[in-house]
Amino acid sequence: MSQQGTGWTAPGAIQRKAILDRSKSIAIVGASSNPSRASNFVLTYLSSSLCDFDLYPVNPRETEILGHTCYPSLADLPVVPDVVDVFRRADDCPAIAEEAVAVGAQTLWLQLGIVSDEAARIASSAGLDVVMDRCTKIEHARFAGGLHLAGFNTGVISSRRA
């Protein structure tokens, strides 16, 4: 799917899987210590034994989330993240895209419900892969076999009687 005027084309499932397969480090911009926030749920999943990522929460108001040191900005990270996973409003994304380019990230990933044509233009024109309106947790689980046609494979919900 091409977004007219941005030069951005949405990567298909094969490309998204390749992005996750080659990535070793993920910076989670907008990470929260609040367990009811989506960013906390995704960080919890990505911290699990199912995943093998080095995780770097980014939030200037936090110092540690789920045992991970939290950093005030992408520039403060001790490594160059492969993926910059964004949990912020679409209006904030162009500035985050510029930061991702400046630190040398490979991928700008905007979470489910977040679309920013300007951020996509900034990142893609600098050679970054761009994923928008997709959840890293859902995509990883999907490719790792944790999702099925009926949804999440939790083993809890069933129509069968015990």
Residue ranges of predicted features:
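A charged, well-structured terminal subsegment
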Residues: 139-162
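Glycine-rich, highly charged phosphate/nucleotide-binding loops
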Residues: 7-12, 65-94
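Mid-chain, well-packed structural core segment of small domains
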Residues: 81-115
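Short, charged, surface-exposed secondary-structure boundary motifs
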Residues: 65-67, 81-82, 118-121, 139-145
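Hydrophobic, well-ordered beta-alpha structural blocks that scaffold small-molecule cofactor pockets
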Residues: 1-59, 66
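A short helix->loop->beta-strand "cap" motif at the edges of active sites that frequently abuts
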Residues: 50-53, 103-106, 126-128
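Rossmann-fold NAD(P)-binding glycine/threonine-rich loop
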Residues: 112-139
